[in-house]
Amino acid sequence: MLALWLFQRFGLDVATTGMIFFVTGLCSAASYFVAVPLARRCGLVNTMVFTHLPANFFLVLTAFAPNLWLAFVLLIMRSLLSQMDVPTRSSYVMAVVEPEERPAAASLTAVPRSLASAIAPLLSGWLLSASAFGWPLVLAGLLKIAYDLMLLQQFRMVKPPEES
């Protein structure tokens, strides 16, 4: 849906869209390597939340970008931060649950993401058909910010053994 919004908002051609997603994908991949030392220094939950919050703020700001270059910069900044929660979340879940509960816990943490991925295109398509403004980006960013704040509130005191 992001590609559709970029096309609607800026008239972006397919080749430029591919280049944007290539660059943001590389940035996301690189961020995995930064997540590990950051988590060692700041803790797993803090790394998840305090990298995801600004990433989601950048997503919201992207909807308000007046031109493609600013949108591109915001998307790059987002991609540098938005995936650092993936390895840290996996590590955290595996550390705080009993070994026999780990497969169920891993599944349980994946289901909400899968459901959101299934519902998001339907809602985004409806929003984009009603307005060319980036409402899907704003809504997604705000929902993710709420998720991050709830995660911090619920789990900031639940330390994995290596952080105790």
Model-derived segments and spans:
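Short amphipathic helix-loop junctions that connect adjacent transmembrane helices
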Residues: 1-17
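Transmembrane alpha-helix termini and helix-breaking/packing motifs in multi-pass membrane transporters
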Residues: 4, 8, 119-138
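Helix-to-loop junctions at the C-terminal end of transmembrane segments
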Residues: 31-44, 128
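Structural signature of the two symmetry-related core transmembrane helices
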Residues: 46-61, 141
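Helix-loop junctions at membrane interfaces in 12-TM secondary transporters
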Residues: 63-75
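Intracellular juxtamembrane helix-capping segments at the cytosolic ends
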Residues: 84-97
